[in-house]
């Protein structure tokens, strides 16, 4: 397909496909580019080698300064002058996420579905339920708002699927119960319209 469709640049955004893309780029002599998104687990040397595919490109894009520093601190042996590492921040479609494009009717309907109280601040944490997305820290922060600062005029929504990680979901629910935040925190597993959720 690379030759048939006259593709000049092969861009991989995750590790498993990056390996096949890397070898395809060698065979077809095309430019190989990767985007390094997260702090991949590298407890073993094999895992670190597996992750290193993201740095075998002519250009590796780090999605943030944090990831840039993480790469330099943990994968320096895979960096060289020939292979460039650059920070390019992820963009958003500002028209798609413009709150002016969301009707008042849709907003009201979502408030009813999620049982949002109008006279309280709403704090939204979107993202799949996983340790490195920070839901535990989020819940702990809510407890600090109440215990240390006596701020109670809020409600929090943790929006995202656990993708089968039931043990982690149970851990979060237990944390909410431990801090007596049951009336403050709602878990919503899915939302088709993220611009609506943000609005």
Give residue spans per PLM region:
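A short, active-site helix/loop in glycosyltransferases that binds the activated sugar's phosphate group
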Residues: 57-87, 92-99
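A short helix/loop element that forms part of the nucleotide-sugar donor recognition site in Leloir-type
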Residues: 76, 98-115, 171-174
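A conserved mid-protein helix/loop that constitutes part of the nucleotide-sugar donor-binding site
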Residues: 121-147, 170
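Nucleotide-sugar donor phosphate/pyrophosphate-binding loop at the beta->alpha transition
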Residues: 28-33, 38-57, 69-77
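Short His-centered aromatic/hydrophobic patch
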Residues: 12-18
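Glycosyltransferase donor-sugar binding loop
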Residues: 92, 126, 155-170
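Short alpha-helical donor nucleotide-sugar binding micro-motif in glycosyltransferases
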Residues: 2, 190-191, 196-199
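Nucleotide-activated donor-binding/catalytic signature segment of Leloir-type glycosyltransferases, i.e.
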Residues: 160, 169-191
């Amino acid at each position: 397909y690379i030759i048939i469709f006259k593709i000049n640049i092969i861009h991989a955004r995750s590790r498993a496909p990056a390996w096949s893309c890397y070898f395809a780029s060698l065979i077809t002599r095309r430019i190989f580019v990767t985007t390094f998104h997260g702090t991949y687990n590298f407890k073993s040397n094999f895992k670190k080698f597996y992750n290193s595919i993201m740095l075998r490109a002519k250009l590796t894009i780090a999605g943030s300064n944090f990831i840039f520093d993480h790469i330099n601190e943990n994968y320096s042996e895979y960096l060289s002058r020939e292979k460039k590492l650059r920070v390019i921040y992820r963009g958003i479609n500002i028209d798609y996420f413009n709150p002016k494009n969301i009707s008042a009717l849709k907003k009201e309907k979502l408030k009813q579905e999620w049982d949002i109280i109008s006279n309280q601040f709403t704090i939204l944490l979107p993202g799949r339920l996983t340790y490195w997305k920070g839901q535990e820290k989020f819940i702990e922060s809510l407890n600090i708002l109440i215990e240390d600062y006596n701020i109670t005029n809020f409600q929090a929504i943790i929006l995202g699927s656990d993708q089968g990680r039931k043990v982690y979901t149970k851990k979060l629910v237990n944390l909410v119960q431990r801090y007596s935040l049951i009336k403050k925190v709602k878990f919503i597993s899915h939302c088709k319209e993220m611009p609506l959720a943000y609005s």
